[in-house]
């Protein structure tokens, strides 16, 4: 029905907006966190990313999504701005409200995503400029969103 169609369109737009906000705040929190991440954090991030690589995305998109959250949590964990960290988590909850495991719909994005994770970790490890880390982190999120949009619009 028309009402249903409008509702779905609205929900989809709301989901896109939440994804866009997450891309922005998460990337900023990651950039602020980067200088404070230590060797242990780097190892932890790589371990999670490795687990993501080994998962069968077609059978377990929810687990992949969960590990993705854990991975990004490590990267922004040392952000000195506590309210910004809270904002990221709040926006994640907004995404969960839509109950979309993005990777269920775009499994082809999973492999690419873990490669981008490694790139991010390497940049942080190398002490790259926070502004550059922020740009790469934001692009990483938006690539997932764009892949999802292409499939669903």
Model-derived segments and spans:
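Conserved active-site beta-strand element of glycosyltransferases/polysaccharide synthases
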Residues: 7-8
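Amphipathic alpha-helical dimerization/coiled-coil segments
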Residues: 28-54
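Acidic/histidine metal-binding catalytic segments
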Residues: 40-45, 84-88, 132
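C-terminal all-alpha effector/ligand-binding and dimerization domain
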Residues: 46-49, 53, 58, 100-153
């Amino acid at each position: 029905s028309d009402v249903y169609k409008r509702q779905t369109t609205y929900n989809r737009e709301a989901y896109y907006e939440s994804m866009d906000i997450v891309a922005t705040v998460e990337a900023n929190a990651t950039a602020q966190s980067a200088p404070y991440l230590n060797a242990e954090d780097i190892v932890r991030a790589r371990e999670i990313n490795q687990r993501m690589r080994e998962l069968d995305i077609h059978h377990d998109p929810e687990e992949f999504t969960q590990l993705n959250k854990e991975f990004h949590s490590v990267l922004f964990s040392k952000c000195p701005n506590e309210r910004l960290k809270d904002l990221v988590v709040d926006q994640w909850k907004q995404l969960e409200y839509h109950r979309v495991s993005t990777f269920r719909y775009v499994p082809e994005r999973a492999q690419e995503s873990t490669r981008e994770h490694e790139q991010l970790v390497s940049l942080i490890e190398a002490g790259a400029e926070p502004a550059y880390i922020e740009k790469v982190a934001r692009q990483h999120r938006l690539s997932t969103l764009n892949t999802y949009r292409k499939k669903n619009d």
